[in-house]
Regions:
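Catalytic core of non-heme Fe(II) oxygenases with the double-stranded beta-helix
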Residues: 82-189
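Non-heme Fe(II)/2-oxoglutarate
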Residues: 1-85, 188-208
Length: 208
C-alpha cells in the first residue's frame, strides 16, 4: 500500500491558504453554519450539535465560496503527494463556539490495518491564540493558513474554545484508495470528491 506520510507522523505546510483567503471564507462559513446543521444525519458522534458532527454527510469543498480556491488541486500538488496520480478527499468545516472542543482522537483505530489516509486541517479564524495538541509537538499554536498533515494513527485534539468568537478550521481526510467498496452509494456520493492528476479535474457531486 502507498502511504502519504508516516501513519504516526506529523508535517506542516506553511501558508497553504493565504491570510486573505482565510479572512474571506471564514465569515461565509459561519454565515452558512445553520445550512450545514440542517443536513439530515443519522450518525452518532461525539460532536452532536456542532458542524463537526456533520463531517460524513456533505463535502465542504463543494461550497460555492470554497470551490474557487481549488483546494483539491493544491493538495495534489503538495510535495508529500507528488507520487500519487489521484486522491479521494473528504472535507468538512469545524466551527467551535464558546465551550466547544474536539476531543483527543485518531482518524483510524490503532488496532485497525492501515487505510492509506492522512488527516489534514487548516486554521482559518479565531480570537487570540488558539492551539491544537498533537502527540509529537504537544500544545501547538495554530497559524492562520498553515496546513497540518497527520498520519491516521496520530493522536490530536483541540481543547475548549474559551472565547465568544467562533474558532473556524477546515479539515480533510485524504485517501489513497477509493473508499467506494466500503460504504453505501449514498454516503460515497455525499462524502468524497475524486481528483485526478491526468485531467486536473475533480468529480464534485454535492453543494452546500
Amino acid at each position: 500500500m502507498v502511504t502519504l506520510v508516516d501513519p504516526h507522523g506529523h508535517q506542516v505546510v506553511k501558508a497553504f491558504l493565504t491570510k486573505e483567503e482565510c479572512e474571506t471564507i471564514a465569515p461565509k462559513l459561519i454565515r452558512d453554519e445553520h445550512k450545514i446543521l440542517r443536513i439530515p444525519n443519522p450518525n452518532e458522534t461525539a460532536y452532536v450539535g456542532t458542524v463537526t458532527h456533520q463531517y460524513a454527510v456533505y463535502n465542504i469543498l463543494t461550497h460555492g465560496d470554497i470551490r474557487p480556491l481549488n483546494i483539491p488541486q493544491r493538495l495534489l500538488d503538495l510535495p508529500q503527494l507528488q507520487h500519487l496520480d489521484e486522491l479521494w478527499i473528504q472535507a468538512w468545516v469545524n466551527i467551535s463556539h464558546l465551550g466547544d472542543e474536539i476531543p483527543k482522537h485518531t482518524h483510524n483505530h490503532p488496532n485497525e490495518p492501515e487505510q492509506g489516509l492522512i488527516a489534514c486541517s487548516v486554521y482559518l479564524h479565531g480570537r487570540g491564540n488558539n492551539y491544537t495538541h498533537f502527540e509529537d509537538t504537544g500544545k501547538t499554536l495554530n497559524i492562520v493558513g498553515d496546513l497540518h498533515l497527520v498520519g491516521e494513527y496520530h493522536e490530536h485534539q483541540v481543547r475548549k474554545n474559551l472565547n465568544t468568537e467562533p474558532r473556524v478550521s477546515l479539515a480533510f481526510d485524504i485517501h489513497v484508495n477509493d473508499p467506494k467498496p466500503s460504504v453505501s452509494h449514498k454516503e460515497y456520493t455525499k462524502r468524497w470528491i475524486h481528483i485526478r492528476r491526468d485531467t486536473n479535474q475533480s468529480d464534485e457531486r454535492t453543494n452546500v
